[in-house]
Protein backbone atom coordinates (compact mmCIF):
# COMPACT_ATOMS: atom_id res chain seq x y z
CA UNK A 1 0.00 0.00 0.00
CA UNK A 2 2.86 2.40 0.78
CA UNK A 3 4.37 2.22 -2.72
CA UNK A 4 0.92 2.36 -4.31
CA UNK A 5 0.03 5.58 -2.46
CA UNK A 6 3.45 7.10 -3.17
CA UNK A 7 3.28 6.41 -6.91
CA UNK A 8 -0.34 7.52 -7.29
CA UNK A 9 0.24 10.71 -5.32
CA UNK A 10 3.21 11.57 -7.54
CA UNK A 11 1.05 11.03 -10.63
CA UNK A 12 -1.59 13.41 -9.24
CA UNK A 13 0.80 16.42 -9.13
CA UNK A 14 -1.05 17.61 -6.02
CA UNK A 15 0.72 19.73 -3.42
CA UNK A 16 -0.57 18.03 -0.26
CA UNK A 17 -1.39 14.45 0.80
CA UNK A 18 -4.24 13.45 3.11
CA UNK A 19 -4.84 9.93 4.39
CA UNK A 20 -8.23 9.40 5.97
CA UNK A 21 -10.18 6.52 7.44
CA UNK A 22 -11.76 5.25 10.62
CA UNK A 23 -9.81 4.63 13.80
CA UNK A 24 -7.29 1.84 13.30
CA UNK A 25 -7.20 2.17 9.51
CA UNK A 26 -3.43 2.65 9.58
CA UNK A 27 -3.21 6.31 8.57
CA UNK A 28 -0.39 7.34 10.88
CA UNK A 29 1.56 4.13 10.27
CA UNK A 30 1.45 4.69 6.52
CA UNK A 31 2.57 8.30 6.88
CA UNK A 32 5.48 7.14 9.00
CA UNK A 33 6.45 4.75 6.22
CA UNK A 34 6.11 7.37 3.50
CA UNK A 35 8.08 10.06 5.35
CA UNK A 36 11.19 9.27 7.36
CA UNK A 37 11.82 10.06 10.99
CA UNK A 38 13.72 13.21 10.04
CA UNK A 39 10.68 14.88 8.44
CA UNK A 40 9.31 17.63 10.72
CA UNK A 41 6.27 16.09 12.37
CA UNK A 42 3.52 16.58 14.93
CA UNK A 43 2.49 13.32 16.58
CA UNK A 44 -0.37 12.74 19.02
CA UNK A 45 -1.17 9.67 21.11
CA UNK A 46 -3.64 8.69 23.81
CA UNK A 47 -2.82 7.29 27.23
CA UNK A 48 -5.84 5.26 28.45
CA UNK A 49 -7.77 6.87 31.32
CA UNK A 50 -5.34 9.79 31.32
CA UNK A 51 -5.26 12.01 28.27
CA UNK A 52 -3.90 12.82 24.82
CA UNK A 53 -0.37 14.08 24.28
CA UNK A 54 1.22 15.99 21.40
CA UNK A 55 4.88 16.03 20.43
CA UNK A 56 6.66 18.03 17.74
CA UNK A 57 9.97 16.56 16.71
CA UNK A 58 11.91 19.77 15.85
CA UNK A 59 11.50 20.90 19.48
CA UNK A 60 11.51 17.49 21.19
CA UNK A 61 8.77 18.89 23.41
CA UNK A 62 5.50 17.35 24.61
CA UNK A 63 2.15 18.93 25.55
CA UNK A 64 -0.97 17.43 27.08
CA UNK A 65 -3.80 18.39 24.72
CA UNK A 66 -6.67 16.14 25.82
CA UNK A 67 -8.05 14.98 29.17
CA UNK A 68 -9.85 11.70 29.88
CA UNK A 69 -13.42 12.20 31.11
CA UNK A 70 -14.84 9.06 32.78
CA UNK A 71 -18.36 10.51 32.67
CA UNK A 72 -18.49 10.46 28.86
CA UNK A 73 -20.43 7.46 27.46
CA UNK A 74 -17.60 5.97 25.34
CA UNK A 75 -16.20 3.49 24.66
CA UNK A 76 -14.37 5.85 22.24
CA UNK A 77 -13.96 9.64 22.18
CA UNK A 78 -13.84 10.00 25.97
CA UNK A 79 -11.17 12.69 25.79
CA UNK A 80 -12.03 16.38 26.11
CA UNK A 81 -9.83 18.97 24.42
CA UNK A 82 -7.36 21.14 26.26
CA UNK A 83 -5.31 23.78 24.44
CA UNK A 84 -3.41 22.75 21.29
CA UNK A 85 -0.08 24.61 20.96
CA UNK A 86 0.23 26.94 17.98
CA UNK A 87 3.92 26.96 18.91
CA UNK A 88 4.17 23.39 17.60
CA UNK A 89 2.96 24.49 14.17
CA UNK A 90 5.42 27.38 14.14
CA UNK A 91 8.19 24.85 14.83
CA UNK A 92 7.19 22.97 11.67
CA UNK A 93 7.19 26.21 9.71
CA UNK A 94 10.73 27.03 10.81
CA UNK A 95 12.12 23.53 10.23
CA UNK A 96 14.14 22.81 7.06
CA UNK A 97 12.68 20.91 4.11
CA UNK A 98 9.56 21.26 1.99
CA UNK A 99 7.38 18.73 3.88
CA UNK A 100 5.71 18.66 7.29
CA UNK A 101 3.70 15.74 8.69
CA UNK A 102 0.70 16.02 11.01
CA UNK A 103 -0.03 12.49 12.17
CA UNK A 104 -3.55 13.07 13.50
CA UNK A 105 -6.39 15.53 12.96
CA UNK A 106 -9.71 14.66 14.59
CA UNK A 107 -12.43 16.00 16.85
CA UNK A 108 -10.00 17.30 19.50
CA UNK A 109 -8.08 19.40 16.98
CA UNK A 110 -11.29 20.83 15.53
CA UNK A 111 -12.17 22.13 18.99
CA UNK A 112 -9.08 24.39 18.82
CA UNK A 113 -9.59 26.84 15.92
CA UNK A 114 -6.35 28.80 16.47
CA UNK A 115 -4.31 25.62 16.12
CA UNK A 116 -6.19 24.62 12.96
CA UNK A 117 -5.83 28.07 11.43
CA UNK A 118 -2.08 27.87 12.02
CA UNK A 119 -2.02 24.51 10.21
CA UNK A 120 -3.89 25.88 7.19
CA UNK A 121 -1.47 28.81 7.07
CA UNK A 122 1.42 26.35 7.26
CA UNK A 123 0.10 24.76 4.07
CA UNK A 124 0.96 27.94 2.18
CA UNK A 125 4.68 27.52 2.85
CA UNK A 126 5.05 23.76 3.39
CA UNK A 127 3.70 20.70 1.67
CA UNK A 128 1.59 18.89 4.25
CA UNK A 129 1.04 15.18 4.80
CA UNK A 130 -2.00 14.74 7.04
CA UNK A 131 -3.66 11.80 8.79
CA UNK A 132 -7.30 12.81 9.29
CA UNK A 133 -10.14 10.98 11.01
CA UNK A 134 -12.90 10.20 8.53
CA UNK A 135 -15.50 12.28 10.35
CA UNK A 136 -13.25 15.34 9.99
CA UNK A 137 -12.01 14.81 6.42
CA UNK A 138 -14.70 16.86 4.69
CA UNK A 139 -13.95 19.83 6.96
CA UNK A 140 -10.39 20.27 5.70
CA UNK A 141 -10.44 23.61 3.80
CA UNK A 142 -7.12 23.24 1.98
CA UNK A 143 -6.98 23.02 -1.81
CA UNK A 144 -4.76 20.91 -4.03
CA UNK A 145 -4.96 17.91 -1.69
CA UNK A 146 -4.67 14.30 -2.83
CA UNK A 147 -7.06 12.36 -0.61
CA UNK A 148 -6.90 8.62 0.05
CA UNK A 149 -9.68 7.00 2.07
CA UNK A 150 -8.05 3.84 3.39
CA UNK A 151 -11.46 2.31 4.18
CA UNK A 152 -12.84 2.87 0.67
CA UNK A 153 -10.16 4.02 -1.80
CA UNK A 154 -12.47 3.78 -4.82
CA UNK A 155 -14.93 6.12 -3.10
CA UNK A 156 -17.95 7.17 -5.14
CA UNK A 157 -16.40 6.06 -8.43
CA UNK A 158 -18.67 3.88 -10.53
CA UNK A 159 -17.25 0.95 -12.48
CA UNK A 160 -19.00 -0.32 -15.61
CA UNK A 161 -17.57 -3.60 -16.88
CA UNK A 162 -18.16 -3.76 -20.62
CA UNK A 163 -18.96 -7.42 -21.32
CA UNK A 164 -21.26 -7.16 -24.34
CA UNK A 165 -18.81 -8.00 -27.13
CA UNK A 166 -19.62 -10.80 -29.54
CA UNK A 167 -16.03 -12.03 -29.85
CA UNK A 168 -16.13 -12.17 -33.64
CA UNK A 169 -12.34 -12.10 -34.04
CA UNK A 170 -12.01 -14.67 -31.27
CA UNK A 171 -14.48 -17.05 -32.88
CA UNK A 172 -16.90 -17.16 -29.95
CA UNK A 173 -17.56 -15.69 -26.51
CA UNK A 174 -13.99 -15.06 -25.41
CA UNK A 175 -15.05 -13.86 -21.98
CA UNK A 176 -15.88 -17.45 -21.05
CA UNK A 177 -12.64 -18.84 -22.52
CA UNK A 178 -10.37 -20.38 -19.87
CA UNK A 179 -7.58 -18.19 -18.53
CA UNK A 180 -5.43 -19.65 -15.78
CA UNK A 181 -8.13 -22.15 -14.98
CA UNK A 182 -11.08 -19.74 -14.80
CA UNK A 183 -13.29 -17.85 -17.26
CA UNK A 184 -11.48 -14.84 -18.71
CA UNK A 185 -14.12 -12.43 -17.40
CA UNK A 186 -13.32 -13.50 -13.84
CA UNK A 187 -10.05 -11.57 -14.04
CA UNK A 188 -11.79 -8.19 -14.25
CA UNK A 189 -14.42 -9.21 -11.69
CA UNK A 190 -11.62 -9.87 -9.22
CA UNK A 191 -9.61 -6.76 -10.16
CA UNK A 192 -12.62 -4.46 -9.64
CA UNK A 193 -13.76 -5.99 -6.34
CA UNK A 194 -12.86 -2.83 -4.36
CA UNK A 195 -15.53 -0.78 -6.18
CA UNK A 196 -18.74 -0.66 -4.17
CA UNK A 197 -20.56 0.90 -7.16
CA UNK A 198 -20.07 -1.67 -9.92
CA UNK A 199 -22.15 -3.21 -12.69
CA UNK A 200 -21.50 -5.65 -15.51
CA UNK A 201 -23.30 -4.91 -18.78
CA UNK A 202 -23.61 -7.95 -21.03
CA UNK A 203 -25.57 -9.65 -23.79
CA UNK A 204 -24.61 -13.11 -22.54
CA UNK A 205 -26.79 -15.21 -20.24
CA UNK A 206 -23.77 -17.22 -19.06
CA UNK A 207 -21.98 -14.09 -17.85
CA UNK A 208 -25.15 -12.83 -16.15
CA UNK A 209 -25.41 -16.16 -14.29
CA UNK A 210 -21.75 -15.95 -13.27
CA UNK A 211 -22.34 -12.46 -11.86
CA UNK A 212 -25.44 -13.55 -9.96
CA UNK A 213 -23.58 -16.38 -8.23
CA UNK A 214 -21.05 -13.81 -6.95
CA UNK A 215 -23.56 -11.14 -5.98
CA UNK A 216 -22.36 -8.72 -8.68
CA UNK A 217 -24.91 -6.37 -10.24
CA UNK A 218 -25.52 -7.11 -13.91
CA UNK A 219 -27.55 -5.61 -16.74
CA UNK A 220 -28.52 -8.22 -19.34
CA UNK A 221 -29.62 -6.72 -22.65
CA UNK A 222 -30.01 -7.46 -26.34
CA UNK A 223 -29.24 -4.02 -27.77
CA UNK A 224 -26.79 -3.90 -30.67
CA UNK A 225 -24.49 -0.93 -30.13
CA UNK A 226 -21.56 0.04 -27.91
CA UNK A 227 -23.36 3.30 -27.16
CA UNK A 228 -26.18 1.20 -25.65
CA UNK A 229 -23.74 -0.52 -23.29
CA UNK A 230 -22.35 2.84 -22.12
CA UNK A 231 -25.81 4.30 -21.50
CA UNK A 232 -27.12 1.22 -19.69
CA UNK A 233 -24.09 1.14 -17.43
CA UNK A 234 -24.40 4.79 -16.44
CA UNK A 235 -28.13 4.47 -15.83
CA UNK A 236 -27.49 1.50 -13.53
CA UNK A 237 -25.02 3.53 -11.43
CA UNK A 238 -27.10 6.61 -10.78
CA UNK A 239 -25.54 8.92 -8.19
CA UNK A 240 -21.83 8.26 -8.73
CA UNK A 241 -19.44 11.22 -8.99
CA UNK A 242 -17.40 9.73 -11.84
CA UNK A 243 -17.49 6.50 -13.79
CA UNK A 244 -14.85 4.08 -15.04
CA UNK A 245 -15.57 2.08 -18.18
CA UNK A 246 -13.60 -1.11 -18.00
CA UNK A 247 -13.04 -3.66 -20.79
CA UNK A 248 -13.60 -7.26 -19.74
CA UNK A 249 -10.95 -8.72 -22.05
CA UNK A 250 -7.70 -7.31 -20.58
CA UNK A 251 -6.83 -10.18 -18.24
CA UNK A 252 -3.61 -8.68 -16.84
CA UNK A 253 -5.20 -5.37 -15.81
CA UNK A 254 -4.59 -5.04 -12.07
CA UNK A 255 -6.75 -3.85 -9.23
CA UNK A 256 -4.03 -1.35 -8.29
CA UNK A 257 -4.26 0.30 -11.71
CA UNK A 258 -8.04 0.57 -11.37
CA UNK A 259 -7.79 2.08 -7.89
CA UNK A 260 -5.06 4.50 -8.97
CA UNK A 261 -7.30 5.81 -11.75
CA UNK A 262 -10.21 6.11 -9.31
CA UNK A 263 -8.10 8.10 -6.85
CA UNK A 264 -6.64 10.38 -9.50
CA UNK A 265 -10.08 11.13 -10.91
CA UNK A 266 -11.40 12.45 -7.58
CA UNK A 267 -10.44 15.97 -8.65
CA UNK A 268 -13.50 15.86 -10.89
CA UNK A 269 -12.27 17.98 -13.79
CA UNK A 270 -10.45 15.60 -16.10
CA UNK A 271 -10.86 12.36 -18.01
CA UNK A 272 -8.28 9.85 -16.79
CA UNK A 273 -6.84 6.89 -18.66
CA UNK A 274 -3.71 4.71 -18.44
CA UNK A 275 -0.91 4.68 -20.95
CA UNK A 276 2.24 2.74 -21.61
CA UNK A 277 3.54 4.64 -24.59
CA UNK A 278 0.12 4.62 -26.27
CA UNK A 279 -3.02 5.38 -24.21
CA UNK A 280 -5.42 2.59 -23.39
CA UNK A 281 -8.37 1.54 -21.25
CA UNK A 282 -10.04 1.71 -18.80
CA UNK A 283 -11.14 5.33 -18.89
CA UNK A 284 -12.64 7.30 -16.00
CA UNK A 285 -15.12 10.01 -16.94
CA UNK A 286 -16.09 12.85 -14.55
CA UNK A 287 -19.70 13.71 -13.90
CA UNK A 288 -19.75 16.62 -16.35
CA UNK A 289 -19.41 14.14 -19.24
CA UNK A 290 -22.34 11.94 -18.25
CA UNK A 291 -24.98 13.56 -20.44
CA UNK A 292 -22.70 13.29 -23.47
CA UNK A 293 -22.05 9.63 -22.67
CA UNK A 294 -25.76 8.90 -22.38
CA UNK A 295 -26.44 10.46 -25.79
CA UNK A 296 -23.53 9.09 -27.84
CA UNK A 297 -24.00 8.77 -31.59
CA UNK A 298 -25.24 5.32 -32.50
CA UNK A 299 -22.42 2.80 -32.38
CA UNK A 300 -19.90 5.14 -30.75
CA UNK A 301 -18.23 4.50 -27.40
CA UNK A 302 -16.62 6.67 -24.76
CA UNK A 303 -13.75 7.42 -27.12
CA UNK A 304 -16.06 9.85 -28.89
CA UNK A 305 -16.16 12.01 -25.73
CA UNK A 306 -12.41 11.63 -25.16
CA UNK A 307 -11.74 12.91 -28.68
CA UNK A 308 -14.14 15.81 -28.14
CA UNK A 309 -12.20 17.09 -25.11
CA UNK A 310 -8.50 16.32 -25.71
CA UNK A 311 -7.42 19.19 -23.47
CA UNK A 312 -9.27 17.61 -20.52
CA UNK A 313 -7.53 14.21 -20.71
CA UNK A 314 -4.90 13.18 -18.16
CA UNK A 315 -2.80 10.02 -18.06
CA UNK A 316 -1.55 7.48 -15.54
CA UNK A 317 1.73 6.06 -16.80
CA UNK A 318 2.14 2.35 -16.15
CA UNK A 319 5.15 0.16 -16.79
CA UNK A 320 3.66 -3.13 -18.04
CA UNK A 321 2.13 -2.81 -21.53
CA UNK A 322 0.48 -6.21 -21.14
CA UNK A 323 -1.99 -4.70 -18.69
CA UNK A 324 -3.55 -2.81 -21.61
CA UNK A 325 -3.53 -5.72 -24.06
CA UNK A 326 -6.84 -7.11 -25.32
CA UNK A 327 -7.20 -10.85 -25.73
CA UNK A 328 -8.74 -10.52 -29.19
CA UNK A 329 -7.69 -13.95 -30.51
CA UNK A 330 -7.00 -17.36 -28.93
CA UNK A 331 -3.33 -16.87 -29.78
CA UNK A 332 -3.16 -13.54 -27.91
CA UNK A 333 -4.95 -15.07 -24.94
CA UNK A 334 -2.38 -17.86 -24.73
CA UNK A 335 0.46 -15.33 -24.96
CA UNK A 336 -0.99 -13.32 -22.09
CA UNK A 337 -1.38 -16.49 -20.04
CA UNK A 338 2.33 -17.28 -20.23
Name each model-derived stretch.
Residues 23:
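The conserved Walker
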Residues 157-205:
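N-terminal glycine-rich phosphate-binding loop and ensuing alpha1 helix
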Residues 186-244, 256:
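Conserved N-terminal catalytic core of the sugar/cofactor nucleotidyltransferase
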Residues 294-338:
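Conserved alpha/beta core of the MobA/IspD/sugar-nucleotide pyrophosphorylase nucleotidyltransferase superfamily
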Amino acid sequence: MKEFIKNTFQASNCRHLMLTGTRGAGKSTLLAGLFGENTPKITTWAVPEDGVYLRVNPLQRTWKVGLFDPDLPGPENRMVPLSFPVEAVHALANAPGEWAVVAEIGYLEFACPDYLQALWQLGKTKRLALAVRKEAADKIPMKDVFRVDLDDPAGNTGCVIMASGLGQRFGGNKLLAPFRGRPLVQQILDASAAFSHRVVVTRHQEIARLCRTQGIACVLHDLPHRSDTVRLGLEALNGVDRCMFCPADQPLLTGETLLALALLSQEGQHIWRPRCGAPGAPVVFPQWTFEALKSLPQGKGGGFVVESFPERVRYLDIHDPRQLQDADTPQLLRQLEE
